[in-house]
Amino acid sequence: MIKIGTEIESPQTGERLIIRSTAESSNGELFQAELLAQPGSYVVRSHRHPSQEERFVVLEGTYGYKIGGRTGIGRPGDTIVCPVGVAHSQWNAGPGLMRILYEHRPALESAELFFETYFGLSREGKLLPSGDMRLLQAAVLLMAVRDFIRITTPPLLVQDLGFPFLAALGRRRGYRARYTRYSSPPAVRDLGR
């Protein structure tokens, strides 16, 4: 289970996440994490949060982003806000380490589930070379966390009609939204911070 101080790594995407605030610790008000991304790391697939505002504070490096139709660069000290429901993606746009603090308001336990599972899959080498999940695994997880995140492709109508079927098939083949091995040591490190 993710809690304050939990640190999770995604070796396939070159990212590390350090949890600063959870749904439980903030009474559902704020999920906050520090993201560290190596140069050339994963470009986060375009997605939207149907019920949350997301805020990014650049701590170090060069933060590349696309929010709606606007592409930009954030530098240390910049704060970038993505309104509820607006499609966005992000990447390390510089030659060095990128560190951002990001916040989701309100906090949803499904966000914690998403990161725990996605980063766990990466640690086991189960992501595609692009950093995406395999189709059936993605359908299972994305159906479970659809209050937190919706990808922008395929279109929402296709997801709404097809993902329930794909998720059911995925569950029959053993895919899960939550794997207990990802939520207990050594899958996550509690740094006691």
Task: Tell me what each language-model feature is.
Residues 9-46, 52:
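A short glycine-rich, His/Asp/Glu-containing loop-to-beta-strand
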Residues 27, 38-41, 62, 106-110:
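Short, charged/polar surface micro-motifs in flexible loops or helix N-caps
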Residues 34-36, 62-64, 101-103:
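Residue-level recognition of well-ordered beta-strand positions that form the cores
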Residues 51-63, 68:
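Glycine- and acidic-residue-biased ligand/ion/polar-headgroup-sensing regions
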Residues 55, 69-87:
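Short acidic-glycine-tyrosine-enriched beta hairpin
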Residues 84-114:
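Ligand-binding loop in jelly-roll beta-barrel domains
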Residues 110, 114-193:
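Alpha-helical membrane-targeting segments
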